[in-house]
């Protein structure tokens, strides 16, 4: 029997579940097909949320184990209970996934547990998790199948000794030596977790810099900070092979520019070279769709080239970020419902949850220089911010880039304490096409770290008062 819906959403990650919930809010009959045992996709289950739980716990452990607590007059002798740390992480994740289930019930979203395959225009077949099959039809179908860890030739992931990001969140012991392949966001965040818990960490990167998409000045500052924390970086390095055994892994390395092979030993290796869109077995050919050379599905305003098929999140162009997928989900469903909706792709923030944190939105200096666009720069260091200094968290800075003529804010780059919670103000400013002067004229509470943003805006015009 064919079950009919207004909208079928394939995938229940941040893009998929938000699309389904919004469709339900708008009164559409909606089904969400997800084969995982729990809702939330990679982000809630094996990505954003569990990694943040471990980052928070490991940061507290490192503060208690090192000199930070003693400096404040707090003397403790902490003992690591890794099993309990993992348990609280799992409990937090479970609570979040149950929350999505509640929202599905609240907004009358039908969760069909299984794996979807397109069967031509407006039709979807589902291999149900319980072994059966279901046939569905809808006027509109939203593909939100997300992404998976990208493989590295010659380095086979077994999640015993050679790990992907999921495996690195589940280790039952602290590695003696963890080698991380890839100095991007995922690699650096998970490196931070295990370094804080006592592992020796070596980060290998093919390029000559960390975090290729990050503003260069910010990336260099972050690398220096992580190096002081004990991480070792080997840039311009290519991994050509890996052999794992019961006791560890042997890696064969070469200079990226070419040269002699050398060996490196580790007891665990994390492969974190990025992610790729996941569309395997989706039946794209039945609706005339094909992915591009990057594996992504093209879209115009979230519409694919196939009638009635929409794409959001990691399977389409743009940064692979949960909040970007959520934004696309809202735009997609509003358009399906016949409403006007737009997304400003220039105002999608990015955050790295290391210590110090990194956050940015908009264009960087390298991009502006490549475009031959004239711009002004305002900087303010956290070492001159009163709240950061009294908290002994004065590493980093805020940098604002504005148009040389109009003063419109073009990009904001932050590295320092709590900047993940501050970048939102910059996003609002850019969404409203604010100038640096607009930020400079806005009163900020004292003493707060957010004052550094105002001072950076003042510095665009040479008027910073506290540095």
Describe every region a protein language model picked out.
Residues 20, 24, 191, 195-196:
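Gly/Ala-rich phosphate-binding loop of Rossmann-like dinucleotide-binding domains
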Residues 127-134, 239-240, 252-263, 275:
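A structured beta-alpha segment of the ubiquitous adenosine-cofactor-binding alpha/beta core
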Residues 8-10, 116, 135-146, 180-181, ...:
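Short hydrophobic core segments
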């Amino acid at each position: 029997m064919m079950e009919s819906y207004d909208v079928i959403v394939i995938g229940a990650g941040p893009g998929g579940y938000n699309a389904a919930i919004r469709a339900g809010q708008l009164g559409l009959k909606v089904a969400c097909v997800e084969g995982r045992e729990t809702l939330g996709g990679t982000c809630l289950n094996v990505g954003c949320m569990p990694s943040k739980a471990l980052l928070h716990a490991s940061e507290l452990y490192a503060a208690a184990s090192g000199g930070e607590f003693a400096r404040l007059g707090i003397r403790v002798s902490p003992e690591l209970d890794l099993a309990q740390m993992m348990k609280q992480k799992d409990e937090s994740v479970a609570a979040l996934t149950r929350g999505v289930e509640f929202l599905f019930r609240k907004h009358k979203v039908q969760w069909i547990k299984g794996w979807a395959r397109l069967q031509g225009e407006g039709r979807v077949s589902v291999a149900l998790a319980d072994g059966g099959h279901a046939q569905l039809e809808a006027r509109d179908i939203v593909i939100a199948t997300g992404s998976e860890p990208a493989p590295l030739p010659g380095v086979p992931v077994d999640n015993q000794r050679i790990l992907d990001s999921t495996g690195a969140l589940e280790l039952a012991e602290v590695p003696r030596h963890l080698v991380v392949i890839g100095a991007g966001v995922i690699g650096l965040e998970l490196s931070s977790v295990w370094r804080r818990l006592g592992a020796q960490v070596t980060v290998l990167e093919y390029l000559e810099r960390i975090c290729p998409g990050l503003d260069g000045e910010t990336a260099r500052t972050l690398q220096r900070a992580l190096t002081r924390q004990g991480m070792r970086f080997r840039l311009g390095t290519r991994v050509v092979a890996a052999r794992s055994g019961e006791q560890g892994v042997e890696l064969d390395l070469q200079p990226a520019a070419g040269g002699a092979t050398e060996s490196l030993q580790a007891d665990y290796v994390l492969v974190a070279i990025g992610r790729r869109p996941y569309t395997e077995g989706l039946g794209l050919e039945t609706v005339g769709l094909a992915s591009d050379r990057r594996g992504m599905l093209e879209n115009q305003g979230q519409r694919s080239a196939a009638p009635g098929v929409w794409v959001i999140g990691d399977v389409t162009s743009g940064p692979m970020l949960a909040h970007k997928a959520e934004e696309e989900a809202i735009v997609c469903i509003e358009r399906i419902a016949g409403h006007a909706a737009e997304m400003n792709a220039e105002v999608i923030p990015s955050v790295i949850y290391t210590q110090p944190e990194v956050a940015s939105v908009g264009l960087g200096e390298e991009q502006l220089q490549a475009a031959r666009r004239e711009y002004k720069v305002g900087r303010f260091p956290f070492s001159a911010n009163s709240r950061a200094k009294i908290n002994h968290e004065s590493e980093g800075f805020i940098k604002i880039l504005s148009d040389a003529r109009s003063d419109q804010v073009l990009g904001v780059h932050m590295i320092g304490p709590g900047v993940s919670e501050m970048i939102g103000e910059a996003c609002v400013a850019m969404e409203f096409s604010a100038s640096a002067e607009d930020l400079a004229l806005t009163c900020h509470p004292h003493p707060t770290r957010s004052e550094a943003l105002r001072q950076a805006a003042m510095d665009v015009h040479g008027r910073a008062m506290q540095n």
